[in-house]
Each structure stands twice: as structure tokens, then as C-alpha cells.
A protein has these predicted regions:
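Basic nucleic-acid-binding interfaces
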Residues: 1-150
Length: 150
């Protein structure tokens, strides 16, 4: 086959360093738009994004031309730099060192979109750690708690 095809949808989740509740409503929409631009520049279009005070969920179509870890690195690095430029509130802002990256089957994309859109509702009832543990279990991905929470 002379053509290269890829249909890889990724659900990316990561928190603020130490799960500090730093993401303010005032910057959230602009942050989401900025991250969408980073993904677009890496040929990985955004499908859905939402965040709460201490973490973010990003659903996107992973490019076949860019390594997944590199795309995540760019999103985390440049969004952190951008936040620090927005307000003194973010002077010592950092994302956690790690992240969760889960593949999403085409049949599940809409369900994951709905899940991401409803983050504020979810987190009225459970915290990020509980949510992330559940998501790892659901995706058959063992979680080593010694290294999961920085």
C-alpha cells in the first residue's frame, strides 16, 4: 500500500503538580484554545477538552507523523509557559510529571466526549485520584500508586 493511514484517538489526562487547585475559570477557555492550537500544529486535531481546578482531559486524533510522547510533552510544556505569562497567580505553575494516555475506539469517541464535557459534574462527587484509578482499571492499565501522584 502506498498510502499511510491512521485513526488513533487518544484520551489524555494529567493534573497540576501536587494536584494543586490552580486552574482558574478566568483562563480556562483560553487555555483550552491554546492547547487546541498546539495540537493543530502537531497535526493532531482536538476533539474535546475540559478541565477542573486540578486536572485536564484532552481528546484528540493522534497524528501519524508525530510521536505520542512528543505531542504530550509539547502540550504540557507550552501550556505551562503560556499560563505563567497570563497572570502572577501562575508564577510557580507546573503540570505533574506523568500523564495517562488511553486509546479510544471509534465507537467510544462520543461517549468519551460526553464524559469530558461533564467534568464539573463528575468532580462534585469524586476527586481526581479516584477518577484516575477508576479510569486505569476500566482500561486494564495497572497503576503503581508510588509513582502516580507527584
Amino acid at each position: 500500500m502506498s498510502q499511510s493511514l491512521a485513526n488513533i484517538v487518544v484520551h489524555l489526562v494529567f493534573s497540576t503538580k501536587g494536584r494543586r487547585p490552580l486552574l482558574r475559570d478566568e483562563e480556562r477557555g483560553q487555555l483550552h484554545a491554546y492547547i487546541a492550537g498546539i495540537l493543530k500544529n502537531h497535526d493532531s486535531p482536538l476533539i474535546e477538552i475540559n478541565s477542573v481546578r486540578d486536572h485536564i482531559h484532552i481528546l484528540f486524533a493522534q497524528s501519524k507523523n508525530h510521536a505520542p510522547a512528543k505531542v504530550v510533552e509539547q502540550v504540557k510544556t507550552w501550556s505551562s509557559v503560556w499560563l505563567k505569562q497570563q497572570h502572577a497567580w501562575y508564577a510557580d505553575f507546573a503540570w505533574q510529571g506523568g500523564y495517562g494516555e488511553f486509546s479510544v475506539s471509534p465507537r467510544q469517541v462520543e461517549a468519551v466526549r460526553r464524559y469530558i464535557r461533564r467534568q464539573q459534574e463528575h468532580h462534585a462527587q469524586k476527586n481526581f485520584q479516584t477518577e484516575f484509578r477508576h479510569y486505569c482499571e476500566k482500561n486494564a492499565k495497572p497503576l503503581d500508586e508510588r509513582y502516580a501522584w507527584d
